[in-house]
C-alpha cells in the first residue's frame, strides 16, 4: 500500500489484527481483519461456507476499520485526481494506476491495490450493525474486483444444476431469479447461487462456482413458499428492502459447489403469465451477459472478463425463459430446455 496511506493507518492495522479470519474461496484465500466485532461478524456470516485454515497464505488481505460519521478517516483526500469509472449514486468507483477507490456516501470508503491484493475500508461506525450493507455495498464490490484479478469472475445470475447439467440464469434485480431458483429447488434442481455465481475459465467454456449467500425474496415469494418465513433474517438494513432467507435452513442438501456451465438462460417475467422459451443468438446473448458482469469496464480485467464471457456464449446454447405463475410448469419448461440441447 502507498506510503502516504500506510503511515496514516499503520496503527489501525495493528488494532484490527486480533479480529482476523481466513476464507478459501474456490482456491483464492482471503484474510479479513476488522477493528470492530460487528464488522468481523458480518463478513463471517457472508463468507461462512468458505472458512479456511488460519495459517493459510492469503492472496487477498482486506482490512475493515471503523470511523466516526463525517470524520476524516477515509482516504478520499488522497484520490481527488482519480479517474471515475462508475457512478451508481449509491457507489462511486475510481482508479489511479493499480489503485481502486470506492466511495459509498453515508457508509464509508475503500482504497485497494489490485496488484498487491490489499484493500482497506473505512466504515462509518453507524452502519457496522447493518450486515447486508457492510457485506454487499461496502465489502463485495472491491473484493469482487480483487477476485477477478485472480481468475474468479462474479456474474449477477442464478446458477442451478440438474443431472450434471449446469444452467446460468443472468438477470437484473427484480427479474425473478430468486423465485425461479426456489421453484427449481422444490422440483429437484440443486443451487449454486440465486443472485451471484462465480465463473472461471474451464477449457473453451466456463465452470460455475457456488456462492451460497442468503436469498433475497419479496413478500409475494414468501407467500408462495410459507416455510421460508421460518428462516427469515429479520434484521433491518437501509439498502436492502427485500427480506432475506437462509437457504441452508430450508434446503441445505440442495447446494452444489461447482458445475460446468452447459446452458445460458435469460429469465424474464411473462407479461401474460404463460411460461415459454425461445432461442437467443450468440451476439445478443453476449451483449446482454456483459450487463451482468460486475465492474466489467475496469481496464485491469475487462479483456479477460470479455474473453471468458465470449467463450461461455460460444460453447453453450442460449435461451430466453418467459416465466409464468405455475412453478411446476416452470420447472418442466427448464427440463425441456435441457432436453433440447
Which sequence ranges carry the predicted segments?
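Conserved lysine of the Walker
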Residues: 177
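Post-Walker A alpha-helix
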Residues: 180-181
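Residue-level detector of anion-binding/catalytic polar loops
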Residues: 190
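A noncatalytic interaction/capping subdomain that flanks phosphate/NTP-handling catalytic cores
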Residues: 1-173, 186-187, 197-341
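Active-site flanking residues adjacent to catalytic metal/cofactor-binding acidic residues
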Residues: 194
Amino acid at each position: 500500500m502507498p506510503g502516504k496511506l500506510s503511515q496514516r493507518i499503520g496503527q489501525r492495522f495493528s488494532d484490527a489484527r486480533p479480529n482476523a479470519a481466513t476464507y478459501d474461496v474456490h482456491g483464492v484465500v482471503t484474510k479479513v481483519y476488522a477493528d470492530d466485532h460487528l464488522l468481523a461478524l458480518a463478513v463471517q456470516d457472508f463468507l461462512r461456507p468458505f472458512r479456511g485454515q488460519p495459517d493459510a497464505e492469503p492472496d487477498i488481505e482486506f482490512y475493515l476499520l471503523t470511523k466516526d460519521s463525517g470524520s476524516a478517516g477515509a482516504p478520499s483526500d488522497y484520490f481527488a485526481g482519480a479517474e471515475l469509472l462508475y457512478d451508481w449514486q449509491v457507489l462511486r468507483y475510481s482508479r489511479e494506476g493499480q489503485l481502486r477507490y470506492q466511495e459509498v456516501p453515508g457508509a464509508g470508503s475503500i482504497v485497494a491495490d489490485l496488484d498487491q491484493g490489499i484493500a482497506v475500508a473505512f466504515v462509518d461506525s453507524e452502519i457496522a450493525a447493518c450486515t447486508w450493507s457492510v457485506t454487499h455495498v461496502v465489502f463485495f464490490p472491491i473484493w469482487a474486483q480483487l477476485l477477478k484479478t485472480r481468475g474468479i469472475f462474479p456474474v449477477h445470475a442464478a446458477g442451478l444444476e440438474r443431472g450434471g447439467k449446469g444452467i446460468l440464469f443472468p438477470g437484473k434485480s427484480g427479474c425473478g431469479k430468486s423465485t425461479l431458483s426456489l421453484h427449481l429447488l422444490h422440483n429437484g434442481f440443486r443451487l449454486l447461487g440465486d443472485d451471484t455465481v462465480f465463473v472461471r475459465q474451464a477449457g473453451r467454456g466456463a465452470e460455475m462456482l457456488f456462492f451460497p449467500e442468503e436469498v433475497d425474496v419479496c413478500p409475494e415469494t414468501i407467500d408462495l413458499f410459507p416455510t421460508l418465513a421460518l428462516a427469515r433474517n429479520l434484521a433491518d438494513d437501509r439498502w436492502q428492502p427485500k427480506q432475506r432467507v437462509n437457504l441452508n435452513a430450508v434446503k441445505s442438501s440442495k447446494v452444489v459447489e461447482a458445475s460446468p456451465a452447459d446452458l445460458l438462460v435469460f429469465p424474464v417475467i411473462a407479461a401474460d403469465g404463460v411460461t415459454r422459451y425461445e432461442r437467443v443468438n450468440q451476439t445478443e446473448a453476449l451483449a446482454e451477459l456483459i450487463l451482468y458482469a460486475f465492474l466489467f469496464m475496469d481496464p485491469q480485467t475487462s479483456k479477460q472478463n470479455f474473453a471468458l464471457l465470449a467463450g461461455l456464449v460460444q460453447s453453450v446454447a442460449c435461451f430466453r425463459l418467459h416465466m409464468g405463475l405455475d412453478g411446476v410448469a416452470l420447472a418442466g419448461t427448464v427440463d425441456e430446455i435441457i432436453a433440447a440441447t
